[in-house]
């Protein structure tokens, strides 16, 4: 009888020590349970010690199998926090919502017109553009009187994405922007194609890597109807080619209603 009592005491001590050792595990602490609680102690024999240990292992594995949840990339603060104050000032200055802010940052990172950027971003300059071609920072642009236009499906093409901004030159301020389709005739033949992203519709796929409407400044009708669009020598795509621009805000609205 004494031997059985001594054996039970030894088993109790061993279980208590092992419980305290596992209780110090960080993952066990995160689970919010305590091994030293009276409900988890059953010092009545060897048969109770084994299932108690397996139960503890199961709980421990469950706590380990739950990875930390990363910050969601769709959060606007994620993008703004990684873009720095310059990107934040540019986005807030444009009055963008969260979705437009993300699209703007995508376009900034790709250094070109992004297929996800469904709205044209254009700074209408009230001052002459810089002679050296270097784009000022957004705060300097706002201080110089630049206005920002977001125009439907349209894109601006004479871009310098190093500052994450797009600018239309002052010399053709009457041009609201440059149309996106690869050619004006493709817009007439396939109405609605101008609103497609990526290659700019069927015409863009035919022209390969040139998704904008390049034109010839020496040919007045190279953009189609000269009353609606004309070839601008001041607005160029990222290949340095002149592109077609609307002659006024009124004609820009007409082109947009026509499906450009």
UniProtKB/Swiss-Prot annotation:
Compositional bias of kind Polar residues: 33-68
UniProt-annotated stretches for the region Disordered: 23-75
Cellular component per GO, a single term: extracellular region
Record's subcellular location: Secreted
Main location: secreted
Keywords: Secreted, Signal
Tissue expression notes: Expressed in mantle distal zone, mantle margin and grafted pearl pockets. Not expressed in adductor muscle, gills, hemocytes or ungrafted pearl pockets. Within the mantle, specifically expressed in mineralizing outer epithelium cells (at protein level). After secretion incorporated into acid-insoluble nacre matrix of shell and pearl (at protein level). Not found in acid-insoluble matrix of shell prisms (at protein level).
Signal peptide: 1-19
Domain of life: Eukaryota
Protein name: Methionine-rich nacre protein
Gene source species: Margaritifera margaritifera
Source organism phylogeny: Eukaryota, Metazoa, Spiralia, Lophotrochozoa, Mollusca
